[in-house]
A protein has these predicted regions:
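Short Gly/Thr/Asp-enriched flexible loops that form oxyanion-binding sites at enzyme active sites
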Residues: 86-110
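Conserved phosphate-binding catalytic cores of ATP/NTP-utilizing and phosphoryl-transfer enzymes
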Residues: 2-3, 105, 114-138
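Short beta-strand segments
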Residues: 9-10, 35-37, 85-87, 118, ...
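Single conserved hydrophobic/aromatic residue that forms the stacking wall/gate
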Residues: 167, 172-184
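Acidic/polar active-site rim loop that often engages polyanionic ligands
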Residues: 147-158, 169
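Short beta-strand scaffold segments in enzyme catalytic cores
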Residues: 17-22, 139, 147-151
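N-terminal beta-alpha supersecondary unit
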Residues: 5-80, 86-90, 123
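General beta-strand structural signal in soluble alpha/beta enzymes
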Residues: 86, 94, 114-119, 160
Length: 184
């Protein structure tokens, strides 16, 4: 039995600070061991949308505790982490820089690889986290100003069927993916 990788994921692309520990089962399917999310909705509510500087400041204040809680809740030890991944974009640059800087420093301190993750690709693949969904599949990705209709053909293989720059609300908050079975 080979050792399954343990990945620490960090997300700070907009107004949520999040950390998760993920591994895989014997079949190679992802297993989420912990997923800690701190929302900033209350911080930005009075402004009618996300204020990037306030969002970045909140990430800086919370990221240590969020990552520690993700590790604690996973039941695993920090020494068991095999790699650290952080969202690299698209997103608000001041927010992304918090997660990227923290993730790179954390990986460096552990002498582990660092993985920069495309925010939209993460959304495109997230339906596979909790299902036996097979490629190809159709995906409606609604994320701020990057809404797309995709044929997800495999890891790194996407065909854009349509796109829209329209926000879904005054705040570019991510909306979870909707999916339909593909007949292709």
């Amino acid at each position: 039995m080979s050792k399954k990788p343990l990945i620490l994921g960090i997300e700070t692309s907009c107004d949520e600070t999040a950390a998760s520990l993920i591994t895989e089962n014997e079949q190679g399917n992802p297993v989420v061991l912990s997923n800690i999310i701190s929302s900033q909705v209350e911080i930005h509510k009075e402004f009618g949308g996300v204020v990037p500087e306030l969002a970045a400041r909140s990430h800086m204040e919370k990221i240590d505790g969020i990552v520690q809680k993700a590790i604690d809740d996973s039941g695993r030890k920090i020494e068991e982490i095999d790699a650290v991944a952080s969202t690299a974009g698209p997103g608000l640059i001041v927010c992304l820089s918090v997660g990227l800087s923290f993730g790179k420093a954390f990986a460096s301190a552990l002498e582990k690889p660092f993985i920069a993750v495309n925010h939209l690709e993460g959304h495109a693949l997230s339906p596979k986290l909790n299902s036996e969904l097979n490629y190809p599949y159709l995906l409606l990705l609604i994320s701020g100003g990057h809404s797309q209709f995709l044929n997800v053909q495999g890891l790194g293989k996407y065909k854009r069927l349509g796109t829209c720059l329209l926000y879904t609300s005054p705040s570019p908050r991510d909306v979870e993916e909707s999916r339909m079975p593909s007949s292709a």
